[in-house]
């Protein structure tokens, strides 16, 4: 299998349009395992931060020496990884006062001042302070007692777990909280971070409330679209998966025998369509996650299902016959396959476009 990266011109357009709305961008590279080629594209596009969720990726970026931008940790950290957080990251998202106190002690040990963004939960029910009073107390403690931390801003996560969409109402709620914190600490915050790629459409259409000035964007820059937004100035289809056909023959479309569960403990759903031409390609769920996130590029191919190492295709309607040894191409229609594909040892990656050629 192989994949190709987008030209940096598209990400630059995205960043510049955010800048037009007075919004900085943290370029999120976790979905492509912080590949150096992608990190370079984001850095050259003018992002404020390079962001990822895993310390191992942070270390790889630092050791590769490819990034001059500040690094942002976007998963709230484990207590056990705080030494690495202080060593490797310039700024991190935080939502727990116990962790903040321990982080302050670690920063003191390392002789650093570490910047933090306090996360608020506005309904998506993942990370974040639920009560405004708790957030205000944490902000005051950071400002006046935790001398090796600097409160850089507040933020929110939406759409990742609870499917809650960004709206003017919840964005304005975040701005109001930021204003309350600013009154308490007596200074302006640097950043009010209004979410991730699903918030981009508000920045593009002018509905983002004033003072939201940082978005954490990965998916939309990598795929050129999200589930709720497909701007015409971004190119889609920038990742191509190639896989070789290892079997092709006519078979029944409904399993024959007593049925149980599949290799993943799931009850399968099968439609009896009679005898159909089927092809297997040499990639499976360990390579990309959900097979129904794949988009066959050849007309007439339908994804039927997958096991760990095989993908099953219906090729009955393909005009030109599919043969063993053919290499078929697929696009993706979701975020998940990128994370799998770029971390799989079984996937060979090729980068085209922009300044990358490999």
Language-model regions, residue ranges each:
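Short, small-residue-biased leader/transition segments that mark boundaries at the very start
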Residues: 2-10
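Active-site anion/phosphate-binding pocket segments in diverse small-molecule metabolic enzymes
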Residues: 171-358
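Conserved, mostly hydrophobic/aromatic
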Residues: 7, 30, 61, 118, ...
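Active-site-proximal beta-alpha core segment in soluble small-molecule metabolic enzymes
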Residues: 23-169, 176, 184-185
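Loop/helix-junction capping segments adjacent to catalytic residues or to phosphate/diphosphate-binding pockets
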Residues: 9, 36, 161-164, 289, ...
């Amino acid at each position: 299998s192989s994949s190709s990266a987008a030209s940096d011109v598209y990400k630059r357009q995205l960043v510049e349009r955010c800048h037009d709305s007075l919004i900085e961008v943290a370029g999120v590279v976790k979905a492509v395992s912080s590949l150096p080629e992608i990190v370079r594209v984001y850095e050259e596009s003018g992002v404020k931060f390079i962001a990822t969720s895993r310390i191992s990726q942070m270390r790889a970026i630092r050791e590769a020496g490819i990034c001059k931008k500040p690094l942002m940790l976007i998963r709230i950290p484990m207590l056990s990884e705080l030494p690495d957080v202080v060593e490797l990251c310039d700024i991190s998202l935080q939502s727990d006062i116990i962790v903040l106190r321990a982080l302050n002690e670690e920063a003191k040990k390392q002789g650093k001042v570490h910047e933090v963004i306090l996360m608020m939960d506005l309904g998506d029910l993942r990370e974040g302070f639920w009560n405004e009073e708790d957030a205000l107390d944490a902000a005051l403690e950071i400002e006046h007692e935790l001398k090796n931390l600097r409160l850089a801003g507040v933020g929110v996560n939406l759409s990742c777990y609870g499917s809650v969409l960004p709206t003017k109402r919840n964005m304005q709620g975040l701005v109001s909280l930021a204003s309350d914190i600013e009154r308490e600490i007596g200074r302006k915050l640097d950043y009010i971070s209004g979410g991730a790629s699903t918030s981009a459409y508000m920045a593009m259409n002018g509905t983002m409330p004033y003072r939201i000035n940082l978005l954490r964007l990965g998916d939309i820059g990598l795929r050129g679209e999200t589930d709720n937004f497909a701007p015409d100035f971004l190119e889609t289809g920038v990742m191509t998966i190639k896989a070789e056909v290892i079997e092709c023959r006519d078979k029944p479309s409904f399993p024959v025998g007593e049925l149980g569960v599949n290799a993943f403990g799931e009850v399968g759903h099968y439609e009896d369509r009679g005898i159909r031409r089927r092809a297997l390609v040499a990639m499976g769920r360990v390579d990309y996650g959900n097979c129904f996130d794949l988009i066959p590029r050849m007309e007439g191919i339908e994804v039927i299902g997958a096991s760990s190492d095989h993908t099953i295709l219906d090729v009955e309607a393909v005009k030109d016959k599919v043969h063993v040894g053919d290499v078929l191409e697929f696009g993706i229609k979701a975020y998940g396959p990128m994370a799998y594909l770029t971390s799989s040892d079984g996937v060979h990656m090729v980068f085209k476009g922009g300044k990358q050629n490999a």
